[in-house]
Amino acid sequence: MSRKKKPIDIFLQPGEYFVADAGYQIRTMLGSCVSITLWHPATRQGAMSHFLLPTRGASKPKQTLDARYGDEALKLMLIELQRLGIPSAQCQGKIFGGGNMFPGNLRSGALNVGQRNGEAALTLLREHGIPVMSESLFGIGHRQIVFDVSNGDVWSHQVMPIGTDSGDKGDLL
């Protein structure tokens, strides 16, 4: 009788990304930050990012790519996948996070950081021709994310702040 080998567990900190094969699962915790997962079904390889802001803007010259920024994190993942012979158009994308961590402090009409991050992720995948298979974006509170690279599944558990009537919400996406 053969036993399924337990995957190697990787935890992403903000500003990190990881590219892996089916022997890994990648986890993180998101507030206003966003994670993009990319999965290639034929090779069972994937990537996940944890970015803080959509872009670094024009204030600093781009010396090297920095995964703290959504546009650069996606470029880094696509470069690594391309090195493995995986075209971006054959990947399946999923997006998570963009929560509003301070709902009482939002000015009327202003986009919060989480909203900007989530919208940037959707735009980035669309611009690269990567289909978005599912998403769990926005809302209040933080999310715990687990990406099983062996099958492309992502578990998302949203935790609402104390004092909200929504409670916890967990989904397999």
Swiss-Prot record:
The lineage of its organism: Bacteria, Pseudomonadati, Pseudomonadota, Betaproteobacteria, Burkholderiales. This is Probable chemoreceptor glutamine deamidase CheD 2. The keyword Hydrolase applies. InterPro entries: CheD-like_sf, Chemorcpt_Glu_NH3ase_CheD, Cytotoxic_necrot_fac-like_cat. GO terms for molecular function: protein-glutamine glutaminase activity. It comes from Albidiferax ferrireducens (strain ATCC BAA-621 / DSM 15236 / T118). The keyword Disulfide bond does not apply. SUPFAM superfamilies: CNF1/YfiH-like putative cysteine hydrolases. Keywords: Chemotaxis, Hydrolase. Signal peptide: none annotated. Its EC number is 3.5.1.44. It catalyses: L-glutaminyl-[protein] + H2O = L-glutamyl-[protein] + NH4(+). It is an enzyme of class 3 (hydrolase).
